[in-house]
Amino acid sequence: IRCFITPDITSKDCPNGHVCYTKTWCDGFCSRRGERVDLGCAATCPTVKTGVDIQCCSTDDCDPFPTRKRP
């Protein structure tokens, strides 16, 4: 599977059986810069924590950089 990976936002091969993920959350600059974004691949979908949104998928390049809402 190929997933987009931050910080370069380039598509890279991930090991067999892995999933792609998009993780977004707010930090102290969220009101000015928008949500923080982490793209990558993992053996399993990361555990969701309070204040963090995680989307997982299992097809090539299914985790593009999300469109940001203007603050």
UniProtKB/Swiss-Prot annotation:
Main location: secreted
Keyword Secreted appears in the UniProt entry: yes
Location in or out of the cell: Secreted
GO MF terms, alphabetically ordered: acetylcholine receptor inhibitor activity; ion channel regulator activity; toxin activity
RNA-binding listed as a keyword: no
SUPFAM superfamilies per record: Snake toxin-like
Similarity field: Belongs to the three-finger toxin family. Long-chain subfamily. Type II alpha-neurotoxin sub-subfamily.
Record protein name field: Long neurotoxin 5
Lineage: Eukaryota, Metazoa, Chordata, Craniata, Vertebrata
